[in-house]
Amino acid sequence: MTERRDNVSHAPDAIEGPNDGAHAEDTSPGFFSFENLGVAQVQVVGGTLNGFSIGFVAVYILLYEVATNCSLFKTTEACKAVGSYGCEWKDTEVCSWKKECDSDSDGVNPCESLIGYSSLYSGIFASAMIVGSMVGSIIAGKCITMFGLKKSFIIVGVMSVVASALNHISVATNEFWVLCAGRVLMGIGLGVVCVICPMYVNENAHPKLSKVDGVLFQVFITFGIMLAAMLGLILDKTVNYDNDPDMAGRFHGFCAVSSVLSVAMFLVGMFLRESTATFSQDDDGKADGGMDPNEYGWGQMLWPLFMGAVTAGTLQLTGINAVMNYAPKITENLGMDPSLGNFLVMAWNFVTSLVAIPLASRFTMRQMFITCSFVASCMCLFLCGIPVFPGVAEEKVKNGVATTGIALFIAAFEFGVGSCFFVLAQDLFPPSFRPKGSSFVVMMQFIFNILINLLYPITTEAISGGATGDQDKGQAVVFILFGLIGLICFVLQFFYLYPYDANQDHENDHGTEPVERILSPVDVPTPRN
């Protein structure tokens, strides 16, 4: 029988009594107090770095397409400035490609294959960080138990700085594989960040503020994505095609933001106060007073692990990544510039995530997550799916309904699904099992992320009858599937969060000693609820 200890986090793992809640309301620190900001800073820096790295790919690919589209540059000076990207000034007084264009091309522009990355390279580039993040989430639990949370932040900071340096080296040498190596390394660090940032807040924030601080991670992820989109819009629209476009300088400037955030992550780790939660390196946790990471076996946690995978499915398999890819296309179809449309979508994504902050002070994580997952699933099914299917609605009606559906889907997702996920990834498990449990849940969402990125375009095209088929058919069917998956996950979460034996004690493995039920904090009310 394993001894159970009480040296756990500040996070509310049990329901407070009325007097305790009132006392906490009177003596707790304010949201903008130094005490709380000292805890929440990990969400600000870690979330922004994560979000900017997510938005990094689309902007970098866009800038690379501009740099390699030699025909855009109108003067000798401008053409020579992009010589490292394969351009040269021809005797015909035009800027063209050093390589011979594909004379057998069926396209309008025979040099189209020389513009930007190939589809294979684009896929490798886009997937590199996600694969690294999956690896990082796997090793996050071991990293926490071996080094502790504070040292884990320092390690991630060092990895991020090295990854950012590789980005700058890639820009200077125009070497694709160096860029991919930097993305993989950054991904490993961010996989760890997705575990340690929410865990540090969960273990160290005041009970009154722990859930509000918890949703900040997703808020600043969306801020980082919007920041990348905004910089991409500015850098794209200010290129001087008649003089020196300074494309290398634009790449370096864009990568410098990631470098600054990486240094900030390292500094956070250096000056961060030690976490109140520590994990013992001793077999039973008695030698140094830390929690025993082996207190619970994987077999004992099968049901929480399963439900963690279900929450990860709600996060990714309802199609947030597909929606983000589909939304810029819709804005382009409506006559909007793609880069501007991309920025507006990301800005809406950020603005809606801000709503989660006041919601977290009034509702439980459970209420926010399952309610918003239901709404988001319905948006996929009834606005983005069925009306888009060919023959169901007229073209104008279809575009209007789909655009509205995407806007409402993003809002519902950020109100409760995305904002609560990283909190629930901690709260579903007892404190001593959180390094393992949270790592598993975060790993599952990265696996689902990879599956969506790989299968979404393939499935859509296949259902549509190929590249020349009606793509609306494939889009509609895929979004209907997203909605159905979301509703199935909703039903499972609804019944799990209201377990039949919620108020009953459970016995230990020997059946002789009652063991205190670990109430999932998704059931725990906030001071205002």
From Swiss-Prot:
What's in the GO CC field? membrane
Map out region (Disordered) in residue numbers.
1-22, 508-529
Stretches in topological domain Cytoplasmic: 1-43, 141-152, 197-214, 272-300, 361-368, 426-439, 498-529
**Intervals, Extracellular compartment:** 65-119, 174-175, 236-250, 322-339, 390-404, 461-476
Offer one example of a GO biological process linked to this entry: hexose transmembrane transport
Alphabetized CDD domains for the sequence: MFS_GLUT_like
InterPro entries annotated for this entry?
GLUT, MFS_dom, MFS_sugar_transport-like, MFS_trans_sf, Sugar/inositol_transpt
Q: Where in the cell is it found?
A: Membrane
Q: Which UniProt keywords apply?
A: Membrane, Sugar transport, Transmembrane, Transmembrane helix, Transport
GO molecular function terms listed in the Swiss-Prot or TrEMBL record: hexose transmembrane transporter activity
- Membrane topology according to the record: Multi-pass membrane protein
Which segments cross the bilayer? 44-64, 120-140, 153-173, 176-196, 215-235, 251-271, 301-321, 340-360, 369-389, 405-425, 440-460, 477-497
Looking up PANTHER family in the UniProt record yields: FACILITATED GLUCOSE TRANSPORTER PROTEIN 1, SOLUTE CARRIER FAMILY 2
Q: What does this protein do?
A: Facilitative glucose transporter.
Spell out the NCBIfam families in the cross-references.
SP
The family note in this entry says: Belongs to the major facilitator superfamily. Sugar transporter (TC 2.A.1.1) family.
Q: What is this protein called?
A: Glucose transporter 2A
What organism, scientifically named, is this protein from? Answer: Trypanosoma brucei brucei
The lineage is: Eukaryota, Discoba, Euglenozoa, Kinetoplastea, Metakinetoplastina
State which gene encodes it: THT2A
